Amino acid sequence: GGGSIVWLDSENVLKVGPGSAGADPGPVAYGRGGDQPTVTDCFVATGLIAPQSFLGGRMTLDRSGALEALAVLGAGLGFHGVDCSEQVADSALRVTTAMMSAQLYKELAQRGVDPRGRYLVAFGGAGPTMAVPLAEEAKLGGVLIPLSPGTLCAFGAIKSRVRRDFVRSV
């Protein structure tokens, strides 16, 4: 999701997730004390999310904070200069798309489904932002975005049957 943390491993290879900043403190751009760049920070750095119109203008994002956090990773990758933050953000979004695409291919293959002509339903807060690059990478037919994609996960949880399994070793 958008809170997935972008980081460098011990070999200075750019990674995304599985750690998440969640909503609190959230991405650096939220200005709530988050200090690790996230996928949302990458969206802000690359202009995919306009800082002044986030949440319909109810929350302004800190683009400079996101750029500074990404610049730290850029230095670890050997990048320098003002544009390195955007390069890191673009690279992180490509890594994110590749990871999601690999998982999608695996799921489709296990079910014997040809992705051509199939549509991706984008849900979650960040889902629609990643949907088009993912659909293109996976060779899907298109993307469907529900009216309220951010609430679709919550709706699914509400409509799901509650089930408890009790297991005891013998």
What kind of region is each of these model predictions?
Residues 1-170:
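N-terminally biased helix-coil "hinge/interface" segments that flank
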